[in-house]
Amino acid sequence: MTPRGSPVHMQISPGFRNPLAKSARTSLVPQPTPATRAAFTMGKTLIIAEKPSVMTDLSRALAKPLGKFEKTGSGRDIYYENDQAVITSAVGHLVELRMPMGPNGKKLPWNFQVLPAIPERFELDPIPDSEARLKQVLKLAKRKDIDRIVNACDAGREGELIFHYIMEIGNIRKPVQRLWMQSMTNNAILEAWQSLRSEEQMKALTDAAKCRSESDWLVGLNATRAFTCFNSRHGGFNITAAGRVQTPTLAILAAREAEIQAFKPTPYFEVHATFGVRSGQYPGKWIDESWKKDESNPLSKPERIWDQATADAIRSRCEGKTGVVTEEKKSQSQIAPQLYDLTTLQREAPFSAKGNLQIAQALYEKHKVITYPRTDSRYLPEDYTANVRETMREIADSDLEVSRYAKAVLAGGPDHVPHLHKSRRIFDNKKVSDHFAIIPTGKTAKLSDTEQKVYDMIVKRFIAVFYPSAEFEQTTRLTRILQDTFKTEGRILVKPGWLEVYGRRPGVASGKDELVPVTAGESASVEHIEVLHEETKPPARFTESTLLSAMEGAGKLIDDEALAEAMAERGLGTPATRAATIEGLIAQKYIARDGRDLHVTGSGMRLIQLVREMDIEGLYSPKMTGDWEYKLRQMEHGQLRRDAFMKEIISYTNEIVSKARKLAEDAKNQSFPDLNVPCPMCGAKGLRQTDATYECRQPDCKFKAKKHIAGRLLTEAEAAELFTKKFVGPLTGFKSKFNKPFDAGLELDAKFKVNFVFDNDDKDAAVELTEEQLIGEVEMPDGRRVKVYQSEKAYHIPELVTKKEPNGIRIGKSILHHEITAEQALKLVTTGKTDVIKGFVSNRTKRKFDAHLTFDPKDGKIGFDFPPRPAKKAAAKKAAKSADG
């Protein structure tokens, strides 16, 4: 039995190594020796893909070297087989790290005494929804005629993890090789098949994948439970999720939100004029020509005037005057943007980050028109020029609108026209990670409108990088009226270069950049002049696009150059996980969408405030993620041992729990100022404030009210309003017993008890239930055990959640003018039917009737079941009717 208060440990199946043991091997699956490789051809090969669609693609592509495959099985149990190989697939992750158990062998309780939960060895469990698929894959892997296994899961960390967790949970010890695919075209699959990688080559990436998984598990589970324990210490269950990537991402948003909330606008003025010349009119804006940038004053700009008198004076002395015009023209060039990686594509494509990823995945996997999308590289391998030429030729021969631009690239030669070239901005082995940039494959397919938009972006970018720079002529025009200067800027496209691919033409300026011409020394008359009243604006809230950019470039927040380099490549999370991180923050209600903007909610701000109070820098700073990514990269290259990395993670996990526990203990002894309001019960001045309560200081007065209600802290201002006015609200941020958020007002009743007040008639929809309100724990007809509570108006079964009853099914205490007793309510839940209840009153006829109540736990619907009438009464009625006839 584990001593109370000790860290939780887990046992593990034989054959699974301890990731922290110094003597542990770094790979469970034995490495293929020359002898085993020679024996590969004697039996069959099992090929495991990550998804069923990839399994089907492999069966078609590999039919050329291995022979035609026959489809076997049906429904979800389909796999492909021929004389040489069997092809099956996972459905994403099939296996997960096991949740820890408590000291008594039951679920781990939510209290500090069992934290930190650090397993001696990590154990695996099937994911329940995918267990049938796992059994099928393992059944094939254990067949005696299978003598080697090829990992054909997605080429990256997660693909390694999915495959190796399957091997480990099944204790499969057969030689393994790796199929590393850059795209899903037949040629790419065949090329990868001809150059299978050994397990030894993949060992370092496998170690990094497992470390990523286990460290996220340790930090996420322990931080979430520690913060939840802290926030629930006054009652309720206020789950507070935290994690390695999620919390630092939230911190970026929270910092911006704090800037916005603290922002105070500063008024300023601008003077705008319209000038007339022989060829027409042009606008101008007054500037201070002596202005110099001041880093200590970011609000200062050359056109801003900080007092109205100065602005009015400028207008007065320039009104109706004539100025002298001078111009300066400069040539500017703009090079084509680099090829897309996933983050850049998600930022620029017109859909949500999650939506863009789903579209890109469909273009890759379903339609096979682009290469692997979950990449963090914007470069191609240096030996990929022949592939690029072939892809460009296929686009040129297609009926795509951009085909003519692809033809121009293929036909080009000199530097000033589009042509294929080996620029380091395109081809660089040092900048290619697991995968290269997203480019088209040259294949075409029928796409939806949304898919076509994203595909067009990728194709145009692929062609544009081989075009020369766009060249502009930048014009800066100054109009001087004695000591006052007005500035006007314009820009015209001279040579479109790569912008030609996007439909731009030379000699054209956009509306605001177009300037009427002036001759040398020409005068300009002031035809209109005005003073504009402006205010400085707060920083813009993050959008998904700008947040993705901040996540990718979080290295800018770090001073350490080596860590910043890792962050520049990976940032917070990876390209494949950033969209899920944003969606996770939204699902947990830490942030919310408001049009394109992302707002941080009150609970999100409170979490970051809590993390800062605990001084856990790694959870509110990108430094920890940069440190982890740097070390995981080292591990991928064989420069860091797996056990050394995990030792640091365990130390960090202990630190998180220790600091959370200490803050909870310190809070008990914290002194608070009195609440300067009279006691609502006895009228004595001032209420004592503790960590948990507001209470009267008079020894003979029993008034006491909780500071934390339904998982929400009642602020001093809110408490003062409640105790003086007997009501406050409505307030947001409450959470029910099952962590469902709700809004409500609070009232202090005649007995000085705090109650919820709801705007609608459904006053008990989100009631916070206590153990004092529990009337029984019963077993339903289907064998499930549930707790039944009572409130003033209803009986509640919180475990039975439906779409209409997200806070749990409720049964009214009064149904058709009849009170339902607790005994009948328990019987209704236990058997699905009450005894006959007499005295219901029909709302329609106003007549009384007797009936059983019935209960359907699936939807919470209450019905009536009418008892049969006595036979003799029915017979007598029939006889009477006959006599009347």
Predicted regions and their residues:
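Intrinsic low-complexity, disordered N-terminal segments enriched in polar/charged/small residues
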Residues: V8-M10, P34
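Hydrophobic, low-acid, alpha-helix-prone terminal segments
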Residues: P19-R25
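Intrinsically disordered, low-complexity regulatory segments
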Residues: P34-S213, W217-L221, K354, R424, ...
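Basic, low-complexity terminal or inter-domain segments flanking catalytic cores
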Residues: A39, G43-L46, S130, A141, ...
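C-terminal or mid-to-C-terminal helical accessory/interaction module adjacent to the motor/catalytic core
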Residues: R143-K144, A188-F275, K330
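Metal- or metallocofactor-binding catalytic centers and their adjacent structured scaffolds
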Residues: E295-Q338
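Glycine-centered, phosphate/nucleic-acid-interacting loop/turn motifs that mediate DNA/RNA or nucleotide
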Residues: H367-K368, K589
